[in-house]
A protein has these predicted regions:
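Phosphate/ribose-recognition catalytic cores of enzymes acting on nucleotide-derived substrates
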Residues: 2, 40-157
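Classical nucleotidyltransferase
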Residues: 1-51, 131-135
Length: 157
């Protein structure tokens, strides 16, 4: 049981579609995971001071709503905490392929072409189109501060 409902795959999918990652992870007994290969991107995050790794998930992978999530990424067997965006990057891209991009707090290596696992822990906010790159950067700075505080108490890898 989870709350007052029987745990079932349909209940897990229902909560995933809402972005309720805490409930999803509790019901599964492990963190919801997306696997993929790191691809080259526009490198705009790097230019703005928060490099991201980019993964296009499988087309049939059920994903939570577009938005910003606190996550961890496994690269070469090591987990790194970060903050990621699930969606389309509407401020800086017109690409309509679903993308998960993640800024990792303690990783400085080269992950291009590597297979990674991304675990989603907590929905922070919906994806949005910002008026400017500067406005987006200010919001991302706030998101990163929030995520670092979260990881001080939760999901240390």
């Amino acid at each position: 049981m989870y709350g007052d409902r029987e745990i079932s795959s349909s209940y897990v999918r229902e909560e995933l579609r809402k972005g309720n990652m805490e409930a999803v992870n509790d019901m599964l007994g492990y963190a919801y995971t997306v696997r993929g290969k790191v691809e080259y991107g526009q490198q705009l995050g790097r230019k703005l001071g928060f490099p991201t790794l980019n993964v296009h998930p499988a087309k049939d992978k059920l994903l939570p709503p577009n938005g910003v999530y606190l996550d961890s990424v496994k690269i070469d067997g090591i987990w790194y905490n970060g903050i990621g965006n699930v969606g389309f990057k509407p401020t800086v891209s017109s690409d309509k392929r679903m993308l998960i991009e993640s800024n990792l707090f303690d990783y400085s290596g080269n992950a291009y072409e590597k297979d990674v696992e991304i675990q989603l822990y907590h929905f922070k906010r919906p994806e949005q189109k910002f008026e400017s790159v500067e406005t987006m950067k200010a919001q991302i700075d706030q998101d990163i501060a929030y995520a670092k505080e979260f990881f001080r108490y939760h999901h240390k890898k």
